[in-house]
């Protein structure tokens, strides 16, 4: 039986996902926020500074056999990415159920 692992990666920098073989990489839309701050607290309203924050998102899909699921999960735990928020979703199929999501 097959299982599918979906990994959502969020980071401030564009990440390389070349660390996994047999994966599909799907680019998700970037979120861009712009902040404008006054430079001086009292006068000079025209003097402002602008800051920008970009959040890059990617979706990685790994299809594997259910008996190799533990190996893939341990591999993902060992090779963690620094400065990245990771959300992992497992889809698997059993003999009794059609499709299970956990």
Curated annotation (Swiss-Prot):
Biological-process GO terms, alphabetical: translation
Major location category of this protein: mitochondrion
GO MF assignments: structural constituent of ribosome
GO CC field: mitochondrion; ribonucleoprotein complex; ribosome
Keywords per UniProt: Mitochondrion, Ribonucleoprotein, Ribosomal protein
Location of this chain's protein in the cell: Mitochondrion
Protein family according to the UniProt entry: Belongs to the universal ribosomal protein uS10 family.
Protein's name in the database: Small ribosomal subunit protein uS10m
Organism (species): Marchantia polymorpha (Common liverwort)
Gene that specifies this protein: RPS10
